[in-house]
Amino acid sequence: MDLKPNIRRKEKRNLLKGEAALEKKGSIDRKTKNKAYPSTTHDPHQNDDSNIPGLGSGLLERIKDIVQRPTDTQLKGQDSNHKKASLTETKTEKAKVKPKAKKKNSKEKISKSSKQDEHKTDVHKESVSKLSKNLESRNNRDENSAKREKNNSHQVEADTNNATEMVSSNAKKSVYPLYYDSATVKKGLKSGTLFKGTLRILENHRSAFACMEDIPDFYVDGPIARNRAFHNDVVIVEPVMNNDSPTEKSNFLQNGVEKVKIKDHDDELGGAMEHLERLEIKSVASFKGDSRTRARVVAIEKRAEISKIVGILRAPGWSLKNVEYVSKKSSYAIFIPKDKRLPFITIHKNDLSDLSGENWIENILKHHDQLFSVEITRWSIYSRYPMGVLGEKLGNITDVEAYTNALLLENGISSSPFSDEVLNCLPPDDWIISHEEIKKRRDLRNELIITIDPETARDLDDAVSCRALDNGTYEVGVHIADVTHFVKPDSALDKEAASRATTVYLVQKAIPMLPPLLCERLCSLNPNVERLAFSVFWKLDSNGKEIGKRWFGKTVIKTCARLAYSEAQGVIEGKSWDDAVGKPIGGTHTPKDVETSILTLCEISRKLRKDRFAKGAVEINSTELKFQLDEYGMPNKCEVYEQTDANHLIEEFMLLANRSVAEHISKNFSNNSLLRRHASPKEKQINEFCHFLKSMNFDFDASSSAAFNASMVRLRSTFNEELVELFENMAVRSLNRAEYFCTGDFGEKTDWHHYALSFNHYTHFTSPIRRYPDIIVHRLLERSLKNTSPGIDKKNCSLVAAHCNEKKEKSTTVQEDSQQLFLSVYIAEYCKKHDKKSMPVQAFATRISGNSIDVYISEYGISNRVDLSSDDRIKSFIVAPDDSSVKITLFDDSQKTIALTDRFQVYLYSDYSRTFFSIRCSLVSLN
């Protein structure tokens, strides 16, 4: 199929601290490899408190602009897909007409010249004050260090193999400063002149932030200030004075191309390097900076784990202006990573694997539409870009599976078959539960236990039960697959599960954490078969209040019915069993028995939900997409999934089970328990969200989780449903990410708190088939019941937590990028089917700034940007002084005015003209 899925990757919902903390159980099947109606939407069976689509790859394209993050407002509408930018600075009036002609050079831009005041906390002021006294000595130190490296370096090896380029050190000028030595770093951290944080690079590639734990983030402006650091590196930064800002303003031309003369392999790239810098730096002339204290990277404490880098290869001299130009003088190819937070990479002609040789340039040109992997090998202080070695060819960028494999590779997710060593740990295919094992457990095989899951789910790891007792009370049970019976500590199977850490759900398939024999058969709580389980029982009244002690223990169960969410919802809505479900029931149970159980559980779950929000939990609904695929695996239907009472039923009891287990294991193992926490929002992020709503004449109180939720309730009653959907997704971006942690790493139990759920103790217990932390928690719970040691020390518990946090973030990135990929293909298929060039959709204006309008498209739960300056059908436009509206004149002299929150029609199309996939948005139809 001739599709070129190069849609712009949607910004990660959780990449910039956007992981929401609600437990939702969606009815989309995220548990099966081959689905009739597959999707990557959140399944509350996972009990994942990051249910709201959020840090790689995200729900809202450039949503940070909506929240008016200062850095992004200065980017002047330049997108991250190497789009050609007009780099002409204009006068600094608040609003002006922008006449546009058909010729590119006749355009003018709107720009705002008002400078934002520098915001500094006391600790920043003190640090900068200290630094200002020593700036001269520091600069001298850097200069002397660079000279020392030059004097000691008589040659520079360009890369591995035989590609060694000899360059006289006297002809070199360093692009980047040397890193501080360990003694200087230690002294600076102790004195408060240096700070340690995690570097977060935005997708415009220029802007970055050094994220701190207890103080406001530092703004790191540009690649020179980043000093060869990558996204997620743990870095040491030094605040800089305004007049010492590492933006090197004197080193940049007005069009944003750096003047620094680079006497290394960069020289061989010739004019191509200048164009690469234009693409990467964008419009520096229109960049106004950030109000936060600026800093520069002076050392790298820990490199982020970078898997293979995926991208496309271009011949030397290539540019978007002239894709056919080739520089015969250069010995270096240009590699453009798919991840826009990564720099361009140069590759010597001898390091191009099978493409090397006498005809290396011709070979590159023949493979212009292929995806490759690359490993970075070296980054000299004399070279603006790192050097690398070409890896494997992944396939054509028009192939969905090739692109999917690229997503997996760049995020370090293994899709390889399980090894023989792992498979040898499994029981035989005909395994059955022994009588000896049944005697060790509580026998629940005759109890009425049901599962409620997505219709096409294969790995059923949780079930529920409800039995009426005396005096209007009930025994409610949650039963979880006993995975640890099969996955023994330190076995090859255990190590593989720990390495994978999570099942990854793509639109078209799932990559399981455990072999199919376990996740689809022996551990799956399929109906009418005996299965091992780990159960939790509560005695509850009709209001959901606990009466008496909880019971935890190993059980053997036999579920009598398997229901899909839609079927359970039909029962809740009063439909008969035959109309709603129409399935046979196992054992001696009747349809009436099952209906009564579902209705009772639903009623109790409503009380639990109401009580949870009354105690301060945050309710934020997320937009979730589901796709229907045809027989060729292509999307022929895409829609937003809606939560129902059946979803909430499972959600509440999974939350209750996770909280109950967390309280139990942390009481028994206070220093060795693996829990999940969610910190309160950072003041900066929440203030930006509140400020945005203030501009909408709405006062949002975020002083506590209870106040936050109360404000969300008021929000829903004030604005229409589609705007509320937008605000809810923006609210997610103001929240931190929830994370796994070892209790021994936090001395104060208040740090264990889960902000969004408003729980003091929380963990993941209910999805051991597809989450490794749940396996650890099962082991801790079992050992606590046996009154033995925890079986895991604090150090290893901390390592597991950190590893699982990283794997979860990467899996979320892949899942969201997979959705973006299929959405782009769906749009392309729609246009092809209807013989159109674009798809009409309704949108809301969420931000008007400079030369662009940010829009939210509720039909697909995505944000996009309408670039007014690059559309030749727009003659001129005038932005109001307060950025509240824009008046647009088309070349047919028709006019339209668009104000914030206005609903209007835009047109989506899949853009294959650049590198990589991109969903673009136009104000005027392309048809």
Swiss-Prot record:
Mg(2+) binds at residues 453, 462. Residues 153-168 have a biased composition (Polar residues). Residues 1-12, 97-106 have a biased composition (Basic residues). Its EC number is 3.1.13.-. It is an enzyme of class 3 (hydrolase). It is found in: Cytoplasm; Cytoplasm, P-body. Keywords: Cytoplasm, Exonuclease, Hydrolase, Magnesium, Manganese, Metal-binding, Nuclease, RNA-binding. The keyword Hydrolase applies. Its cofactor is Mg(2+); Mn(2+). Its main location: cytoplasm. Pfam families: Dis32-like_C, OB_Dis3, RNB. Residues 13-31, 107-152 have a biased composition (Basic and acidic residues). Residues 1-168 are annotated as: Disordered. One of its GO terms (biological process) is nuclear-transcribed mRNA catabolic process. InterPro entries: Dis32-like_C, Dis3_CSD2, DIS3L2, NA-bd_OB-fold, RNase_II/R, RNase_II/R_CS, RNR_Ribonuclease. GO terms for molecular function: 3'-5'-RNA exonuclease activity; metal ion binding; poly(U) RNA binding. One of its GO terms (cellular component) is P-body. The record marks 461 as: Important for catalytic activity. 3'-5'-exoribonuclease that specifically recognizes RNAs polyuridylated at their 3' end and mediates their degradation. Component of an exosome-independent RNA degradation pathway that mediates degradation of cytoplasmic mRNAs that have been deadenylated and subsequently uridylated at their 3'. Belongs to the RNR ribonuclease family. DIS3L2 subfamily. This is DIS3-like exonuclease 2.
